[in-house]
Amino acid sequence: MRLRHERARLSALVALAALVSAGQAVTLRAHGTEARRVVSLTWKRDHITRVLDANRSELGLNGSKAPAQMMTIGGQACLFGDLFAFDVDDRYAFDVDEPVDVTVTYAPDRTQPFAIAWDKNGGDGYGISKEISPEPGATLRKATVRLERARFAGLGILNTDLAVGARGGIALCDISIVRSAATKAAAPRGRVQIEVKDAETGELVPARLGLYDATGRTPLPSDQALLIHRYADETRLLWVAPRLLWPSAERQAFYVNGTYETQVPAGSYEVVATKGPEYRVFKGAVDVKAGQLARVAIPLQRFINQPSRGWYSGDTHLHLMREQTQDVAVWGQVAAEDVHVGNLLEMGNIVTTHYRQPAWGRAGRYLRDGHLIASGQEDPRTTERGHTIHHNLQKPIHLPPEDFFSYHKVFEASHMQGGVSGYAHMAQIFNGRRGLSLDAPFGLVDFIEVLQGGRLGVDNWYPYLNLGFKISPAAGSDYPYFGPSLPGVERYYVKLDGPFDPDAWYSSFKAGHAFVTNGPLLDFTINGRGMGEEIHVARGAQLQIAAAARLNPDIDAMGRLDLIVQGDVAVTERASGGDRIELRKELTADHSMWIAVRATGNREVPAQGQLQELGAIAHSAPIYVVVDDQPFWKTPAVAELVRGEHQILQDLLTAPVDPMGDLEAWETVSVLAPQWERQRYLLRSRVQQADAKYDDILRRATARSSSAQARLGSAGLVVVAAFALAIVRGRDRRRRC
């Protein structure tokens, strides 16, 4: 049954791909691109103007990649699918604040437990009902859910108001909406005028704002708030996810470019403003009287001025389409989060490209007031080999479908253009470790995105450092995915010796002069040399290590600062109060090694291995200590690491294809799977070359350790050599298969 169900879903996806190519999906909107699966359905119901079959609701419920089906059950026209979004007729209810009853008619034998999500006043700005278990015993059943503080202001996907979803599907046969008409009459209005300035310079600055009445409701922003692009949505009001810096229990916010004015009902309001981790949070209040103007001056105080210290932040991963290079709204959103380099990525799959950029190279850069937006690409990207990112390109690089899995060709072309290239989501998903395992030994990978979604994925980074590869850390929000997030929630800082310059910034990042963070700010030197640098010393030389971490107390209190030597915690300093920790240590350089530092906040979050370290966290790029010109391998671990890389490459060649694994499977399903079956066999020679490079590292590491093993006795040497030989012979046998 399960296989038949999967085949049916796959057939439906192929059919949907044909519909999309025929132009029957929801059309794209200005400044956005519809990278979600969204199909408009004809299913008329009272007080409903539009019904969408979608894979996201933007109200807290998500669906799947499979399209909905129409069917007749009990004489009624029913929809079967995972998620449906509904646009409530504005003439019936718009921007209300009252309980609303929603009654759903469903077919129990075709319905899994389901929930209803809605556009809500206060709190997160959306509500999700308790899961409703289908009640068997009849062809059709009804369930009524009361939506508390329903708003219906079009804040869901493509300006919808509520959604019904079930993992595994719901057969939805009717839906009715009944207002309680309890919304209070609007109070007389006054005006509020807000100015946001940098307290040091007195200059107006972009910022993220919140404005909340006594009930937690935020008035819909005026057109002076920045118009934000979220996929193909255009909105001014955004949800601030719990892991994002925000000091209020009310978690809806908007962006302003220094000034903001609007009309609001008379009353008392809470005012909140933030501008990234280098600024203290502002919280204040304003009383608005009917017919009068209330002014609010917000002086944002610096916690620290990183640019004055030579550090400039970036977000490696933003999906924001521009129609022109000088897009003030896109720039404003990035600048409001105080991100100095916002990398706007086209997002390609084997069929098409989303989030198109208007120009490339210097022509694609918009630099204003020290904040830059620039074109880049996330392409190629597949579930089979992972997602790749390429910055600072002079022109986009898109492989044809018949060569789409030859990622190395894009890396090589990027480097020829002066680009900086790496792998995305390495704390997350999409099998990026397979692609990294294949491309790293050829020296193609400049960075990996180790911090994203609140997670630090060192499990996919440390092994390559321990095998002697210099790979820089990067961090990116992947806006509007992951939450949704907001730009700069995870960011990386790059060190410059002079004034901010985009070319120098990308060069310094490629050289590894960087750290990643979602809050803590790092300093780290060895013998006066900084992150990403290489220090050559003689055996026995003394290493003077100095490190420090600071954390804006509005984010969290400082917790600890760890000194990491080849993946192991060598020294820990714990906070004793205040917003700063210092670590000073002297080590003896008895072998080559890489050394880094990691800082965390005080809030304890359960961890599941190194992948799941959540909370405030930062990690530096390594400093590479080279003793007597020897590689900085973690020699005792090399044999096991090489064996692991061989297995990963074997998985790349043999793992079964997941036709629905691609993020936009509705677009790619008819092309990607057959192309992968053809092309992965063409990768065998590339895999064999990578295997040979790993084997060479193993041979050299074994030879290097022979003298040390001899001191342990000849038996120890024989065991190590035999282990290494067994791995190599195993590789040779596999090559002959």
Regions found by a protein language model. Give the residues of each.
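Extracellular carbohydrate recognition and processing domains
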Residues: 123-155
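A cross-kingdom C-terminal cell-surface attachment/processing module
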Residues: 714-731
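Solvent-exposed strand-to-loop "edge" motifs in beta-rich extracellular domains
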Residues: 105-110, 550
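Beta-strand-rich domain onsets/edges
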Residues: 178-191, 197-202
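Extracellular beta-strand ligand-recognition surfaces/modules
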Residues: 142-175, 317
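Catalytic cores of extracellular degradative/oxidative enzymes
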Residues: 255, 282, 306-484, 502-504, ...
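Glycan-recognition and processing domains
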Residues: 28-93, 122
